[in-house]
Amino acid sequence: MKPLAIPANHGVMGQQEKHSLPADFTKLHLTDSLHPQVTHVSSSHSGCSITSDSGSSSLSDIYQATESEAGDMDLSGLPETAVDSEDDDDEEDIERASDPLMSRDIVRDCLEKDPIDRTDDDIEQLLEFMHQLPAFANMTMSVRRELCAVMVFAVVERAGTIVLNDGEELDSWSVILNGSVEVTYPDGKAEILCMGNSFGVSPTMDKEYMKGVMRTKVDDCQFVCIAQQDYCRILNQVEKNMQKVEEEGEIVMVKEHRELDRTGTRKGHIVIKGTSERLTMHLVEEHSVVDPTFIEDFLLTYRTFLSSPMEVGKKLLEWFNDPSLRDKVTRVVLLWVNNHFNDFEGDPAMTRFLEEFENNLEREKMGGHLRLLNIACAAKAKRRLMTLTKPSREAPLPFILLGGSEKGFGIFVDSVDSGSKATEAGLKRGDQILEVNGQNFENIQLSKAMEILRNNTHLSITVKTNLFVFKELLTRLSEEKRNGAPHLPKIGDIKKASRYSIPDLAVDVEQVIGLEKVNKKSKANTVGGRNKLKKILDKTRISILPQKPYNDIGIGQSQDDSIVGLRQTKHIPTALPVSGTLSSSNPDLLQSHHRILDFSATPDLPDQVLRVFKADQQSRYIMISKDTTAKEVVIQAIREFAVTATPDQYSLCEVSVTPEGVIKQRRLPDQLSKLADRIQLSGRYYLKNNMETETLCSDEDAQELLRESQISLLQLSTVEVATQLSMRNFELFRNIEPTEYIDDLFKLRSKTSCANLKRFEEVINQETFWVASEILRETNQLKRMKIIKHFIKIALHCRECKNFNSMFAIISGLNLAPVARLRTTWEKLPNKYEKLFQDLQDLFDPSRNMAKYRNVLNSQNLQPPIIPLFPVIKKDLTFLHEGNDSKVDGLVNFEKLRMIAKEIRHVGRMASVNMDPALMFRTRKKKWRSLGSLSQGSTNATVLDVAQTGGHKKRVRRSSFLNAKKLYEDAQMARKVKQYLSNLELEMDEESLQTLSLQCEPATNTLPKNPGDKKPVKSETSPVAPRAGSQQKAQSLPQPQQQPPPAHKINQGLQVPAVSLYPSRKKVPVKDLPPFGINSPQALKKILSLSEEGSLERHKKQAEDTISNASSQLSSPPTSPQSSPRKGYTLAPSGTVDNFSDSGHSEISSRSSIVSNSSFDSVPVSLHDERRQRHSVSIVETNLGMGRMERRTMIEPDQYSLGSYAPMSEGRGLYATATVISSPSTEELSQDQGDRASLDAADSGRGSWTSCSSGSHDNIQTIQHQRSWETLPFGHTHFDYSGDPAGLWASSSHMDQIMFSDHSTKYNRQNQSRESLEQAQSRASWASSTGYWGEDSEGDTGTIKRRGGKDVSIEAESSSLTSVTTEETKPVPMPAHIAVASSTTKGLIARKEGRYREPPPTPPGYIGIPITDFPEGHSHPARKPPDYNVALQRSRMVARSSDTAGPSSVQQPHGHPTSSRPVNKPQWHKPNESDPRLAPYQSQGFSTEEDEDEQVSAV
């Protein structure tokens, strides 16, 4: 077995001279691709290219292309009010947000090309897709590349098609891309092969023969085939490309020769595997152009095969003494410090290594390198919090301080007493003190700092290592000693040397060393980021100091993440401004970066607002900056209130009210800063006269404050909630160290124990249950609906913020069983939001490895920051880890490690930002408010105006002055959201949620109050074996007095044994797998011919609009919907339920059609047998029109277009003889759903969008058993016609009215089986890589695996639903509004049944003939579908008939039906509320079921 390989990553480092130090930081950014300056574009056309390093796109390119307008979501019309009311929404903008995704299938396009026509790009596309499949595991990248170049694509349309016969000669090696096949051996054993499995010849030219018979299990099976000759040549050629490095007769390293393109310019040897010692040595060897990221990959992954980093450290120190290796060693250490500084922090041995290395650099006079090392250390160092206590105020401090704002520096620790508590706490020389007891020390005089430290016995100190600035401070002090006077730079020099061009600046950091200070007012502005206010100020004020680039000090992430090629920002443009006034032994090294680490060199910019009260409750709004102190606020407040006293007579007080109503008042220290962040919602700032003891806040005011601090979700701005969620998620996401992914994946022990990763992992569960808790705790139904609407809007805005994690969590919360079952609540939701919710769900369609989501994520303009869906990240990493061996032939499989490292770099790049997290998500809010707050500002404001408005011309004229009140209100809303989110009480127990759900809407509420109110009626036939209790109920059901012949046939059909839906999913070794043969007319054309056969018929059928039902039912199925024409509504093949993806795209991998997951193995023999089998196994084996209708209704749920009747006509006869089959879930059908039937489940992702399995197994539970009875609730036994041929149109119309239950699958979230997929998903952590995401990996399409040792049971947990009439009852007029009521309290109820229009009545003059009335294979002359326009016109003119039309069967009170007349014409039945036919069902509560002998378990 050969180790995996990946396309080589071309970083800048790979092109530079290896022996020279990079001249600037651009060379230190080892990036996979260079990112341009972040420009903000609408999210539909945006997308950071999170693609592979070789330029290939990821698997998501299956649905490659743009999202059309889907993500534009120009919600500028949503005003920011306390509550976003329904009426305030801009209809146009919301609707634009809900446009469907339009994508094309690039991988399919590449596969369908002739192999000789494939370009390098095509091969890269295929390579990226194929590497996910198990069949290609442990192959080197060059082998995969060659296989992709010669593979041929084949499609087998129909389930049950024999692909290979026993004893047939094999001619190819094949891999299943979609669907599954079953191999039946002569001894009767059977084996299932799924997506990603391979079969066929072994890599020899010997003749091999098929063992057993291979049949397709599902429709639309897709394969790639490689001819035996090519397969043999490619795999045997591998050895020729290998270069083995031997030492003392043992192989210590294996390299592979690789060509990355056909030009021959990118070729060389790349390390495949080696011993740990040899891999370490390779760090300082020459690296080829095809292996530019070896050092980065090694430094990230060495921990998987080395016990200690010092093994590498010792070697590096040793090699440093070799002058020829010195530069390379320095480069490795710089990269190590920059990329993984956490390896050094907290590890004494590594800290000593770093100090020793610094000493070596000093010794060798490598000042430039040393400076870079110090910059990297300072940039990557994390803030540390330590607590010191002194016995008394007079006790001396155990450390000596230097610096101070008077020197233009912060406060630094010069020395620490050895053995003191400060040393034990981790304080060391070179630490900068950032904060003490909440007071900012970044811009404070040394004397003031010493005073604060001395006057407190309890010290909570925040420090950060900043050796770079500390050494500059020492240099300055030594210069002053020599020169005798402090150096004060001229103002002109500062301005000249510090011009910044913000758009060219791509680092999210502050200017480096602020040596120049004009006065103490030039404070360290740590709020970060430019904004609109800044732009306004710049017009009216001369900036003495340079404008500050984006930074993020004080937001929880130090300004470290983009200085020397950090993990997030992978690129610093060469166009960085020069601002160097610093003397240096090697100034050119720092010409564009020596300002990066200054914490105290920016002007004081007011971008926050405080509301300050006086004792008489007057208030003023005061503009401040983050570092404005309480003393300065007092001065401003005195001026604003026009008080004549001196500032010394007043102080700033904070008055707060506890939840118990206790008023607290405290005077704030004069030097306290960050005032806007400290104020609580239940607090106010007061200007207090020190000489008076007045009451600042009365009891009435306190009560008002208390009321204001009590927040409900509906009071909060959806935009602000989404913004705060995104900021919180992003903080967690960006703080994850790359090494944490490795530690978690390989289960390594680490100092941090992956704390950041675990926190981010937990967020998705917390947010999911937050949604459910918030909805279910609301007792008022209307408010519940509004909360659901609120969450949909929040999810929409999360998408704007590219926060896919929260968006997914919210959608998951809305789909949790206890929420989804609230039918009456969902019914009240406006159509617009229903559609929005549907579109949001669409994005996370799990089919084909989350292809739609990946496509959006990889779209070309999506720029960071991006918060990806974490479970997908974890699943991908787990697949790479578990799908490939860590050691091959006793050597470390470095190819596997390289692939994992590349994936982690891709994830890290999503967090690469160059602005403050507090601002980055606000820039996506477009023009939400008429006057944006500063916190929404951006230097790219002009770009935003153009790019984010989606072409809308309407603009709100911005005020040219600052509206402090508006800014305060915006900030107050942000505070409310923060407080709300911080005080959430989550209900994480699903049982408790279910209880709350039942309290909101008791199970009895799902029963119809009367027959005519559009509520469903229950059916009695169940496709599953009921539990014991249900069986007893079924036996007690009153039996019909006589049985029509069709029922007898059905009864015979019931004797057909049930077929297991749960074949084994065990993986089979490739060598044991049966393969394609060559007994076809042309070698290698076996499957292709099968594919072409269907293709011809498809084209024929597409031309025949008037095809007969009989012929269509018995004819060969069309080719797959993936084949062109892509969007044709071709007939679904026999045995399908739906073969169409929901957007008209083709699907290649991971997901076959619904029937691919649900078809049974038995092959229909005759029409009657087929019909019997259908009933016995509860599957629609032959509903030809179904696919089209599901397809149509899925795409346009609001428009069950009249055009749908035309394609439907081809399959009508089928429905006339269909049988009634019920669902195991508490589905409901409604009377007026026909026109707008939304059959979202037609593609596997829609039916079960939370399923990660490519096979979407829950569709077997939802679609197969829900859809089967929904599509067949009207047979000849259901209608009032039996003698004359009843109108096909009538049955079709009945089908329209009855057949579909809107959202039946989408919201049918809880198939009663506790072990069902939905239950497993909602209970398990979404982030579980081996459970929810890992188990359902790509390799097992079309089968259902065992979970937790039990088969996923389709059997209902409490009881199965039953149909109103069975084949054994006499024909009873079936009310059009068949309803299904739940006898279980936990079932999910499909919602919105009562909303849709009824379909038009049966057009007069058309008759339908049951398909059983004429022999198979012959079309009936009278079965020509009506002309569409005529039928439509007539249907509009004819009034509906009610129960008055002719006598009807009357249901006896005890449920014994009698037939009162033969049925001559199809009639629409709209019974009165007191319709006697429904009485028995009302009285019985619809809890009865058929006899158990009628029940055939589908399991």
Swiss-Prot record:
Known tissue expression: Expressed in primary neuronal and endocrine cells (at protein level). Highest expression levels in brain. Lower expression levels in heart, kidney, lung, placenta and blood leukocytes.
Bias-annotated ranges (Polar residues): 1247-1256, 1307-1331, 1441-1462
Keyword flag Secreted: no
Protein location: Cytoplasm; Cytoplasm, Perinuclear region; Cell membrane; Late endosome
Biased composition range(s): Low complexity: 1031-1040, 1111-1125, 1141-1160, 1355-1366
Positions with a binding annotation for a nucleoside 3',5'-cyclic phosphate: 135-254
Keyword line: Cell junction, Cell membrane, Cytoplasm, Developmental protein, Differentiation, Endosome, Epilepsy, GTPase activation, Guanine-nucleotide releasing factor, Membrane, Neurogenesis, Phosphoprotein, Ubl conjugation
Domain N-terminal Ras-GEF: 267-380
UniProt-reported outcome of changing residue 211 to R: Abolishes cAMP-binding
Domain Ras-GEF: 717-944
Cytoplasm among keywords: yes
Post-translational modification: Ubiquitinated by NEDD4, leading to proteasomal degradation. Phosphorylation by PLK2 promotes its activity.
Record-listed Phosphoserine modification sites: 501, 806, 930, 933, 1022, 1080, 1089, 1095, 1116, 1120, 1159, 1176
Pfam family, one: PDZ
Phosphothreonine: residues bearing it: 644
GO annotation (BP), single: neuron projection development
Primary localization class, coarse: cytoplasm
Residue span of region Disordered: 40-59, 68-101, 1002-1050, 1095-1160, 1224-1256, 1305-1499
InterPro entries: cNMP-bd_dom, cNMP-bd_dom_sf, PDZ, PDZ_sf, RA_dom, Ras-like_Gua-exchang_fac_N, Ras_GEF_dom_sf, RASGEF_cat_dom
Record remark on domains: The Ras-associating domain is necessary for the Rap guanine nucleotide exchange activity. The N-terminal regionis necessary for cAMP-binding. The PDZ domain is necessary for its targeting to the cell membrane.
Disease: Epilepsy, familial adult myoclonic, 7: A form of familial myoclonic epilepsy, a neurologic disorder characterized by cortical hand tremors, myoclonic jerks and occasional generalized or focal seizures with a non-progressive or very slowly progressive disease course. Usually, myoclonic tremor is the presenting symptom, characterized by tremulous finger movements and myoclonic jerks of the limbs increased by action and posture. In a minority of patients, seizures are the presenting symptom. Some patients exhibit mild cognitive impairment. FAME7 inheritance is autosomal dominant.
Protein's recorded name: Rap guanine nucleotide exchange factor 2
Organism: Homo sapiens (Human)
Organism classification: Eukaryota, Metazoa, Chordata, Craniata, Vertebrata
This protein's encoding gene: RAPGEF2
